Design a protein with these regions (language model features):
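Mobile "lid/hinge" segments at catalytic clefts and subdomain interfaces of large enzymes
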Residues: 63, 162-164, 168-233
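Catalytic core of soluble alpha/beta enzymes
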Residues: 229, 246-362
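Glycine/serine-rich anion-binding loops at beta->alpha junctions
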Residues: 31-32, 122-141, 173-185, 232-233
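Flexible, glycine/charged-enriched surface loops at secondary-structure junctions
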Residues: 102-107, 126, 153-154, 219-237, ...
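Metal- or metallocofactor-binding catalytic centers and their adjacent structured scaffolds
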Residues: 55-151, 160, 207
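N-terminal mitochondrial targeting presequence
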Residues: 1-20
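Structured beta-strand/loop patches that form or line metal/cofactor-binding pockets in enzymes
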Residues: 19-62
């Protein structure tokens, strides 16, 4: 035990510190969409390597932190990440060397506020270094910190956030099974139709329930519309071009749940991504935009009515981005009306930005 303790800790002037950052490396890798993204390695004073890669979205909010791209159209159609990778090597690596890997807040603040330092009206925006460079390093540091404290990553993150660590609730996966919006070449404006196996007794059982329902849905789509209906969209959900609207989609999902034998165990979540079909000139939402039509143009109140009707008819427990990213007023109205029954999520609205979160709370 003593040798292990000596390996894990370093004593400096009577205080015990954990492993420190010896080197940070980064590289360009390819994500699930075939686009470049950033992967970072944090190498500690113990010689251990901790790795993390960052995701990116097909439809992103205008207030999200800057994802630094090369904009060289001759390479990856402008989506290369070599600038972000270089920033890890030349800016982050020398500045973070020697810092205790458990000093997550200190490291994050140093990257965002000191090394990058760029701000917009909503706060720190990471335009110099790039959010993709900063996040890759931050995630890798978190893994190093968890290892240094000999804790599972989820426990370590809860500790950093000041949350209770004596009890944990197993998260319920939200499984994207039908794609629309910017994720699929069909007429559906709602971007993600997800299932949540809330009746499962373990995470592994939840994944099994989700998988079985997904495959029953595949069989159902093929039998109703033919093989082309089982083509998948940007995030792995089916992008069946034959499906006309959200009601037909939800009926298919309910039938797949019933056929899989999991009725009563599954709730439904929607990621509407409403900014994608919002018209800023009229202040209205066009649910027939992808068809090039205007027969389903709605006000925010009418759209709220639609959500309320769907939540009454189907077991919908979560709705993400139901309105445009600047439509705070509609979020307020919908929360008052449906908030006790449905979880209302602001992704493009809040973009994990402290100032926007504060505005949302107020």
């Amino acid at each position: 035990m003593l040798s292990k303790t000596l390996q894990r800790f370093t004593t400096v002037q009577g205080t015990r510190t954990f492993a420190t950052i010896s080197q940070i490396k980064a590289r360009e890798i390819i994500d699930s969409r075939g686009n470049p993204t950033v992967e970072a390695d944090v190498i500690t004073s113990e010689g251990k390597v901790f790795r993390a890669a960052v995701p990116s979205g097909a439809s992103t909010g205008i207030y999200e932190a800057l994802e630094l791209r090369d904009k060289d159209e001759k390479r990856y159609l402008g989506k290369g990440c070599l600038k972000a990778v270089n920033n890890v090597h030349t800016l982050l690596n020398p500045a973070l060397k020697g810092i205790d890997v458990t000093q997550q807040v200190k490291i994050d603040k140093k990257m965002v506020e000191e090394i990058d330092g760029t701000q917009n009206e909503w706060g720190w925006c990471k335009q110099k270094v790039g959010a993709n460079a900063i996040l890759a390093v931050s995630l890798a540091v978190a893994r190093a910190g968890a290892d240094a404290k000999n804790l599972p990553l989820y426990h370590y993150l809860a500790e950093l956030a000041g949350k209770r660590t004596d009890k944990f609730v197993t998260p319920v996966p939200s499984l994207n099974i039908i794609n629309g919006g910017a994720h699929a070449g069909n007429s559906l404006e709602i971007q993600e139709f997800m299932i949540m196996p809330t009746g499962a007794t373990s995470f592994s059982e939840a994944m099994r329930i989700g998988s079985e329902t997904y495959h029953h849905l595949m069989k159902l789509l093929k039998s109703k519309y033919g093989k082309s209906a089982a083509n998948v969209g940007d995030e792995g959900g089916f992008g069946a071009p034959q499906i006309k609207d959200e009601n037909e989609t939800l009926e298919l999902i309910m039938e797949a749940i019933q056929k899989s034998g999991h009725s009563g165990k599954i709730d439904i979540a929607l990621d509407v991504a409403a900014s994608e079909f919002y018209d800023a000139k009229t202040g209205k939402y066009n649910l027939s935009q992808k068809l090039g039509k205007t027969d389903r143009v709605m006000t925010s109140d009418q759209l709220t009515d639609l959500y309320a009707t769907l939540a009454e008819k189907y077991p919908i427990k979560s709705i993400e981005d139901p309105f445009d990213q600047d439509d705070f007023a509609s979020y307020t109205k919908m929360t008052a009306r449906l908030g006790k029954k449905v979880q209302i999520v602001g992704d493009d609205l809040l973009v994990t930005n402290p100032k926007r979160v504060k505005t949302g709370i107020e």
